[in-house]
């Protein structure tokens, strides 16, 4: 029989009032019911359609209480006005709610519905199989006995002697007596929580467990009188999973993070970390999100380092913020500081790395309008050197003003970049300076789908007021100004054709381009700069001339030295796109030809090094990327790097290599602080290998290895073994890295072993291969761009 009405209560009452009269009139109720059921679908099929389906509250278009009711059964009987009984494959459906049972009846006037025998209940977020269900139609309170439940919108299942669902002030509460909870799949009891009482309020991400036991393979591991566990995907207050490791530097390590979800837009993570060789450290990470942007405050404090001289306290902190206000104002802050220069060498940190030479301390505020913007910036560094002095200049402050005016008469675009900067350094042998820079630019762009031509003229005016202190050099001046005109003409073509390779159709593009650049040669010896002064320049370093850098209009990152130019740059790129217009191969080649030939190290150069870049993606499982700069004059490769990777079915292997010649470092790396004592004076030649692959039965392994070929020593290596089941994960990692100079005869290494464990479903686990299990700086990285 199929009945439809606006409420289950109305349906039951109508049967209670009129059912007896119907039965007395013709005594054919059972027969009529069976006849009508012949027009409906099989009840078992209806249950299978909803079993395991998630219908989240936000996905429901209407209030289920206002939806019509559909009741199907083999037989319905109303003996009097106090009880109506349904028997045989009873199914009651209302919106997202479904109840199925062998038998169901209504008791009046209490408005109590009772379902018995193979009871199934589904309300969109939870499904329950039980022996008996009792529900109050007035309050929607329910009880289910000897129940097995499954959460349909999030991981979680279990069983209970009784499940009670109650309502109070619009909120529903679930309570389980003698219940269990796990995120493992059915028939898998790798782990579970058991408790005499489990409680959950509505859609709360927590479950409260009383007299709780944690069991592994049905064996109790620990007992707690009260435990609160996360059962949803929301950010949750509570202890996160601990980590255990052992290293030759810090000894035994144990840390237990505690996460505090203060508010929807504030949270705090407190991590006590015990190191047997050093002591107890407290790490904090506070994050916030406001109308002015987002930021974080990180702190690390070790009260008494047993491995340090005099048991000194050691610390580090970082504050970062970026955001906007009313769409015009932009804010950016990044400030870090530490107690001593060896902090990141001695202690693993989320604030800095052991390779860092400086800690950045910067803040800026910007205001933007349609045609102009302005930025006030301050920047400092904490040198991580024994003397506390470094080569970097403080910017205290810098004021930038930029003006843009496109679409002037004759299709011209105009812009004006300007700045006033104050540079300071504590070293007595380095000058300080105030610099004023103006850079008006006129641009005439022209473009079609296949051709472009851009002409540009600039005037670079710079004024310096330099405090030389004890620094001296012939020609350097305290006050100096410089005006340099520049001109640039850049043109490019875009051509394409259909082609076929090995029976596969492709679209090939050919993109040649040519540029003429003129920068007037001016005497700049009066300025402290990277050409006339070894390691000089306030904020200028030489840019790397890769393929795209060849077409830049400047050689240095800033204006302390403006390299003269009278030159042509010629280059071309070709790309191959498959039938889905997915880029599969690219090759770029370019070179600069000098009209006015520059002199470098007393050698006249007629052309620059040839820059080559290529990338290849074959069938989304084999990737290759490489770049090279080849100097034909010296017949040597200046810079080269490359990586090839096989990635398929959870397996990846990536050999990679990077190289910088010693002559390139001698010529162009003029900042002595950028060349460390790890053998870089002999150039850089480093080989790396990263790999990861699954083994049998949920086991997987990953490894990284990096080797310096110049000194024939390992830089860093690690290997990790991970076991992942459907509901838990455990990983063991060994890491070894050089903790002293590779150039020394007796390089020291630190060794670390770490163990991680995670219950999947209670807390998200990072995918295998996404990041390193240790704090090593060198690990697997996906540098390929043709994998879109």
Curated annotation (Swiss-Prot):
Residues 1-23 form the signal peptide. NCBIfam families: PRK03761.1. It comes from the Bacteria. GO terms for cellular component: cell outer membrane; transporter complex. This is LPS-assembly protein LptD. Keywords: Cell outer membrane, Membrane, Signal. The keyword Membrane applies. Together with LptE, is involved in the assembly of lipopolysaccharide (LPS) at the surface of the outer membrane.
